[in-house]
């Protein structure tokens, strides 16, 4: 049985000497991973439902002297790109030792079990940057955060579409739009889309008036009483350039404002100048928060 780590064991260097052992996670590891996550400084944000994948071969834990001192989980969401969904290690465990122990196992299993072609890492706080670079990862993109204080600026548009709330029947169309509008790095599966549809405070689609074809969507959620975040906006390439994105954004901002939201944020790639121009027109401004995306071709 794996020992439950105390806060002392997670922080004291003397407790972190010895050989590292990498194995597949199991359901019984949840409490130990959770305790480690609560106390560790080097960790990725909680943006994925990693607890549900503890049985999967791509969820790895690292042990030292029968104590769980690290975890690494990657998942390709019906995409050739596997994203690191959880990375956490004890504060006194050298980063290079952890990487050298667990990364080769993760890469091997990603290729064997999911056919992954690329491993991607969103490096919040830059704690892994040097180690990633030393292991062949390349800086692929920067994600920047923008926000607007409501009410927003209006934007003219002439698109011949109508809007309605998204439903479960739209899932296939939503996934198709995702795959057409984004690079594989950003694809979402129908399962992920269904989760967002069930959980999001705001999920709207744009439909062509004649055929009722779904051509775009926007999805966002509340962050407390007065803040909201736009998680995703996508317009099918065949329908880009007609102001649909502007109308989707405007409708979402109005709805959030009417529900008491005062500030709305979103993320976008630094290279996506077209999207940034639209957001700027709507009153969004950069917050200064930047996250580097690292990728490794497998």
Residue positions per predicted region:
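Acyl-donor-binding surface of acyltransferase catalytic domains
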Residues: 1-13, 78-80, 90-159, 292-294
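Active-site rim helix/loop that mediates acceptor-substrate recognition in acyltransferases
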Residues: 12-13, 37-65, 73, 182-210, ...
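A short beta-loop-alpha structural element at the N-terminal edge
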Residues: 14-33, 162-174
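Conserved donor-binding loop and adjoining core beta-sheet/short helix segment
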Residues: 47-103, 218-228
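Conserved acetyl-CoA-binding loop-helix of GNAT-fold acetyltransferases
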Residues: 95-108, 235, 241-254, 258, ...
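Conserved hydrophobic beta-strand within the GNAT/NAT acetyltransferase core sheet
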Residues: 118-122, 230, 264-268
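Conserved active-site alpha-helix within GNAT-family acetyltransferase domains
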Residues: 123-141, 242, 246, 270-288
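C-terminal "cap" of GNAT-fold acetyltransferases
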Residues: 144-162, 167, 262, 267-273, ...
């Amino acid at each position: 049985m794996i020992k439950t780590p105390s806060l002392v064991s997670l922080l004291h260097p003397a407790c972190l000497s010895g050989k590292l052992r990498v194995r597949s996670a199991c359901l019984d590891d949840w409490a130990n991973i959770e305790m480690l996550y609560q106390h560790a400084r080097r960790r990725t944000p909680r943006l994925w439902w990693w607890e549900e994948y503890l049985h999967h071969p791509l969820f790895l834990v690292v042990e030292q002297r029968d104590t769980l001192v690290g975890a690494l989980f990657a998942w390709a969401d019906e995409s050739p790109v596997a994203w690191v969904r959880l990375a956490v290690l004890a504060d006194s465990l050298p980063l290079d030792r952890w990487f050298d122990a667990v990364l080769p196992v993760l890469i091997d299993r990603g290729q064997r079990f999911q056919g992954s072609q690329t491993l991607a890492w969103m490096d919040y706080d830059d704690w892994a940057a040097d180690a990633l670079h030393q292991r062949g990862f390349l800086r692929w993109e920067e994600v920047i955060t923008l926000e607007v204080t409501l009410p927003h600026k209006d934007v003219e548009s002439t698109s011949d579409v109508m809007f309605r709330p998204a439903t479960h029947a739209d899932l296939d169309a939503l996934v198709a739009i995702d795959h057409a509008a984004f690079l594989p790095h950003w694809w979402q599966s129908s399962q992920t889309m269904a989760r967002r549809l069930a959980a999001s405070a705001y999920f709207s689609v744009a439909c062509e008036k004649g055929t009722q074809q779904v051509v775009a969507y926007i999805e966002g959620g509340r962050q407390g009483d007065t803040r909201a975040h736009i998680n995703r906006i996508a317009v099918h390439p065949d329908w880009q350039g007609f102001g649909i994105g502007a109308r989707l954004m405007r409708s979402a901002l109005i709805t959030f404002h009417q529900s008491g939201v005062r500030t709305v944020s979103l993320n976008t790639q630094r290279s996506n100048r077209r999207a940034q121009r639209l957001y700027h027109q709507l009153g969004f401004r950069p917050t200064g928060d930047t996250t580097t995306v690292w990728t490794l071709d497998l």
